[in-house]
Amino acid sequence: MKKKLLAGAITLLSVATLAACSKGSEGADLISMKGDVITEHQFYEQVKNNPSAQQVLLNMTIQKVFEKQYGSELDDKEVDDTIAEEKKQYGENYQRVLSQAGMTLETRKAQIRTSKLVELAVKKVAEAELTDEAYKKAFDEYTPDVTAQIIRLNNEDKAKEVLEKAKAEGADFAQLAKDNSTDEKTKENGGEITFDSASTEVPEQVKKAAFALDVDGVSDVITATGTQAYSSQYYIVKLTKKTEKSSNIDDYKEKLKTVILTQKQNDSTFVQSIIGKELQAANIKVKDQAFQNIFTQYIGGGDSSSSSSTSNE
């Protein structure tokens, strides 16, 4: 699951409840035994230096800050729709997937909501930066729709064999795709797919190769990163249709806006800067030295800023 803003290793409840214990109190007993107990405060002192606990506290802070600032602008239906999509994707395994990630349905909903609140904030800032220069840059880099047939394979030697057949005179590329491609979404349609430079359906290497082809041209074997770590997949592409790019930028204005905003959402540095600004505006104050550095990736040292200061008040 993408964009995990809430950690699952330690529950939000444990850190939230234990952090509320005053320093002068042991709090309630969590465990009792013959001749001894383990109190909330004792447990808190043990877990607060754990990186997972610190990540949870960071995520809780982000959640609260963004909920206060943008919560009224986010419809719960957006969260419910995402949950519905995940349930459809994972089917009867959904609860098991959540459990393996250390989450319940409710904590997953909270995670998704926080992620969408951050996306909303990023979108607002990005829209304010939609300058003519940004549009021109996006236009220069944009390639409109092409239609191609693709064959995806998991073995390079097999890909070379199929390529030889694909480049033979009179080759039926569509049939080769049906017989050999591992791409279940396109193989039954002869490998046909339409995409532009902003599409995410095919790897960047495949798009680049396709855009360089003439109509009816067939690429060499293209190596692209696979879906599993350290794996590769191999593509053969035949270009069947090419759209001429208009010289009028206004013809693509809405598309270019989407491209620019998507790039901003995927720019981790930009996203971190937005989170940092919101945290600073919220005047974050760290009350326990154990957590003084949890905001450094967003707003620098936890004890070096008045908006993210360590305090024992």
Curated annotation (Swiss-Prot):
Protein EC: 5.2.1.8
N-palmitoyl cysteine: lipidated where?
A: 21
Q: Please give the InterPro entries that the UniProt record associates with this protein.
A: Foldase_PrsA, PPIase_dom_sf, PPIase_PpiC, PrsA_foldase, Trigger_fact/SurA_dom_sf
Q: Which reaction does it catalyse?
A: [protein]-peptidylproline (omega=180) = [protein]-peptidylproline (omega=0)
Lipidation, S-diacylglycerol cysteine type: 21
UniProt entry tagged with the keyword Cell membrane: yes
Per UniProt, the keywords (alphabetical) are: Cell membrane, Isomerase, Lipoprotein, Membrane, Palmitate, Rotamase, Signal
A molecular function (GO) held by this record is: peptidyl-prolyl cis-trans isomerase activity
Q: Where is the signal peptide?
A: 1-20
Q: Which SUPFAM superfamilies match?
A: FKBP-like, Triger factor/SurA peptide-binding domain-like
The record's function comment reads: Plays a major role in protein secretion by helping the post-translocational extracellular folding of several secreted proteins.
Protein's name in the database: Foldase protein PrsA
The organism encoding this protein is Streptococcus pneumoniae (strain Hungary19A-6)
Q: Which gene encodes it?
A: prsA
